[in-house]
Amino acid sequence: MEVQLGLGRVYPRPPSKTYRGAFQNLFQSVREAIQNPGPRHPEAANIAPPGACLQQRQETSPRRRRRQQHTEDGSPQAHIRGPTGYLALEEEQQPSQQQAASEGHPESSCLPEPGAATAPGKGLPQQPPAPPDQDDSAAPSTLSLLGPTFPGLSSCSADIKDILNEAGTMQLLQQQQQQQQHQQQHQQHQQQQEVISEGSSARAREATGAPSSSKDSYLGGNSTISDSAKELCKAVSVSMGLGVEALEHLSPGEQLRGDCMYASLLGGPPAVRPTPCAPLPECKGLPLDEGPGKSTEETAEYSSFKGGYAKGLEGESLGCSGSSEAGSSGTLEIPSSLSLYKSGALDEAAAYQNRDYYNFPLALSGPPHPPPPTHPHARIKLENPLDYGSAWAAAAAQCRYGDLGSLHGGSVAGPSTGSPPATTSSSWHTLFTAEEGQLYGPGGGGGSSSPSDAGPVAPYGYTRPPQGLTSQESDYSASEVWYPGGVVNRVPYPSPNCVKSEMGPWMENYSGPYGDMRLDSTRDHVLPIDYYFPPQKTCLICGDEASGCHYGALTCGSCKVFFKRAAEGKQKYLCASRNDCTIDKFRRKNCPSCRLRKCYEAGMTLGARKLKKLGNLKLQEEGENSNAGSPTEDPSQKMTVSHIEGYECQPIFLNVLEAIEPGVVCAGHDNNQPDSFAALLSSLNELGERQLVHVVKWAKALPGFRNLHVDDQMAVIQYSWMGLMVFAMGWRSFTNVNSRMLYFAPDLVFNEYRMHKSRMYSQCVRMRHLSQEFGWLQITPQEFLCMKALLLFSIIPVDGLKNQKFFDELRMNYIKELDRIIACKRKNPTSCSRRFYQLTKLLDSVQPIARELHQFTFDLLIKSHMVSVDFPEMMAEIISVQVPKILSGKVKPIYFHTQ
């Protein structure tokens, strides 16, 4: 069964009838307006081929005779209506009528044209139904579908039908266009600038030199049909999805790649058929709702694009039905550099890129070619409306999140060198140029072939290439969990994306205890450490700014005066609450009882001021004796020295320890952000880095420490830094928050919630217990300072240091200083021994806590790339190099008591 292309659908057609839809009723107003079309235009008759069989008199027209016969029979509309409700039009020429017309008018008989179908046994041409392999140009036009019931065209319906719908006419036009093709090549430079406003048929007539005839001439002349009727006809045709420019098709020779089957609408880039330069009869028909006639919705949105087709570099002007109406205002001029339309040998890559997979659902064969090479530095596609055309408009609602690269030719491409070409299937759109910064760092510039320019490295082993996020499998290999059991070597810690680079070589350029030490020699913008950690001294009682050391503690002036009056007075204070009132800068006067208790807990005593004065007096006397050099001594001086020795509980050693004690260090934690494991642990690591710098300065300022070998100095600090920080944190927690929380820093205090959130609750509980020991044992600040110095010399390698003998002597001197401080306030030897036992037992309890924290930090460093915890460079180096030695037993602490 033959299939005829209809309006918006495909339906079977009987051999002698064709159907039209209900749109015919919309032309009623046009029929009433068009009554006297007038004589045929002379140019229309001139261009009509002999095969059209035009009649000179209306009375002898076959259509006129059929109309009269149907009128005599009665109502012709009643019996020609099809089963589906469509109106059926009889064939224009039955075999008998064709023979009668041939006999009655022998001068009008003609030979069949090559493209026309011939009736069996007859030599007359017959208009066959459009086969599936014929182009849409041979389909019935809008006016030919009106049929014999069009009253306004009753006098010239046969002529119009023959002109608009006879295949011989199209064949003659094709022959004339092929004969004049060489003239078009000479006018190539003129055709690239002019705009075709009358459609493809008008361009063909201009090329052949024939006088131009508009559609108005075919519709009945220039005076009988009003302009409003013509505009109404056009509007109704467009609203029904019809193309009124049926004559504006090109010949098969000219329809190379932009024919009506594959051409896009509204001046867009033509969609290319799979086989280049295929002849026109091979073009399969499409339903009108999927073919070029589907242009009603795009016309309203892209009216600015509607205009004459641009001409390519080869001078061929390609067009299709429904796309040739244009005015001078809607013209788009395309420069010759934009080769959107090509004739002859078009690039297959560009052909596949311009193919519209949504508007033309055909089985297009052939794999897609890679995108055409672009500029080496091109990272952004310069969007041109002509690059999208109707393909973009038609597929905008279908592929909103789809592959946009296939619609506009895959123009989003990365650099031609330095990175792999982008595939058209990727929907990533690069919006960063080579000069702009990206989310993960500067983008690799186009044309660079270095591996570093392939893409910026993002966190956790991913890199961002120009077209998206791909896995970086070769740049990172996760470190396996390794617990040393034999020979300890350097442990490879994670890649630099988890370690901040702030420290260079280990304290190589340290110029002294108070010198200008930089964090990293490679960073010129780093200021001295004192700039980052200014000495912040706060009152240990209320937290206000401290004015100095008063009565043995660092306090402000207000707490100094309060303690003097409260300690010397005989008034006893009672707390109205539970002896746990908050004492700060604003509430320090609310409860004198809790404030005085806190003063005693901080180590304030009335005798500390007198002892300090006596110590200064001893220094003055020793200086005078050394300067005098007299062998004889004054008895009064002997009495003074002996009196000072009796009160010598504040030795010079303690003065040095108080002077070199580090100040308060902040962690830089943002307490406004919600607590998380990564944020808390990263802040602890940052605090450890800052405190480690102060530990180095403090250790090098200790008496006798610089006499050690340089390697021994570094080893002692790297082995004991964890115990020193834990011990100092316990003291801060005791003095500031009464051991209820862990006071790591003023901006980083761990309560119960943060202890659980940090996943180190057991370690935090042990550190809080250590802080409580300071209160239970009533540790004084002097004892704390001496114990902290002794803790530095409490862990050494099993094989010993390079100068082990001097280390043992230095450690013994610090033990004697601790015993002297204990004996200073106690006259009973038994009490001194008990106190010494308590303090040394407290020192031994620090080592297990430090070892447990060593294990935790080492495991955290191995998994830092998975848990997003940052480790400063110096911390990562110590943990990866020195901590495994402690965990493996190569380095062991020195205990006072048997464990």
Swiss-Prot record:
Annotated site location: Interaction with coactivator FXXLF and FXXFY motifs: E877
Where are the Phosphotyrosine modifications? Answer: Y218, Y262, Y302, Y341, Y352, Y357, Y358, Y388, Y514, Y531, Y895
Where does this protein have coiled-coil stretches?
none
Where does the record put the Glycyl lysine isopeptide (Lys-Gly) (interchain with G-Cter in SUMO) cross-link?
A: K381, K500
Q: Which residues carry this modification: Phosphoserine?
A: S61, S75, S251, S630
Amino acids binding 17beta-hydroxy-5alpha-androstan-3-one: N685, R732, T857
Q: Which one of the record's GO molecular function terms can you name? A: DNA-binding transcription activator activity, RNA polymerase II-specific
Reported modifications of this chain? Phosphorylated in prostate cancer cells in response to several growth factors including EGF. Phosphorylation is induced by c-Src kinase (CSK). Tyr-514 is one of the major phosphorylation sites and an increase in phosphorylation and Src kinase activity is associated with prostate cancer progression. Phosphorylation by TNK2 enhances the DNA-binding and transcriptional activity. Phosphorylation at Ser-61 by CDK9 regulates AR promoter selectivity and cell growth. Phosphorylation by PAK6 leads to AR-mediated transcription inhibition.
Q: Where is this region: Interaction with CCAR1?
A: 571-898
Superkingdom is Eukaryota
Region (Disordered) residue ranges read 35-146, 175-222, 436-471
| Occurrences of domain NR LBD (ranges) | 648-879
Q: Does the keyword Disulfide bond apply?
A: no
Q: Where does it primarily localize?
A: nucleus
Subunit field text: Binds DNA as a homodimer. Part of a ternary complex containing AR, EFCAB6/DJBP and PARK7. Interacts with HIPK3 and NR0B2 in the presence of androgen. The ligand binding domain interacts with KAT7/HBO1 in the presence of dihydrotestosterone. Interacts with EFCAB6/DJBP, PQBP1, RANBP9, SPDEF, SRA1, TGFB1I1, ZNF318 and RREB1. The AR N-terminal poly-Gln region binds Ran resulting in enhancement of AR-mediated transactivation. Ran-binding decreases as the poly-Gln length increases. Interacts with ZMIZ1/ZIMP10 and ZMIZ2/ZMIP7 which both enhance its transactivation activity. Interacts with RBAK.
Its biological purpose: Steroid hormone receptors are ligand-activated transcription factors that regulate eukaryotic gene expression and affect cellular proliferation and differentiation in target tissues. Transcription factor activity is modulated by bound coactivator and corepressor proteins like ZBTB7A that recruits NCOR1 and NCOR2 to the androgen response elements/ARE on target genes, negatively regulating androgen receptor signaling and androgen-induced cell proliferation. Transcription activation is also down-regulated by NR0B2. Activated, but not phosphorylated, by HIPK3 and ZIPK/DAPK3.
Question: What PANTHER family does the entry give?
Answer: KNIRPS-RELATED PROTEIN-RELATED
**Protein name in the entry:** Androgen receptor
Which organism does this record belong to?
Mus musculus (Mouse)
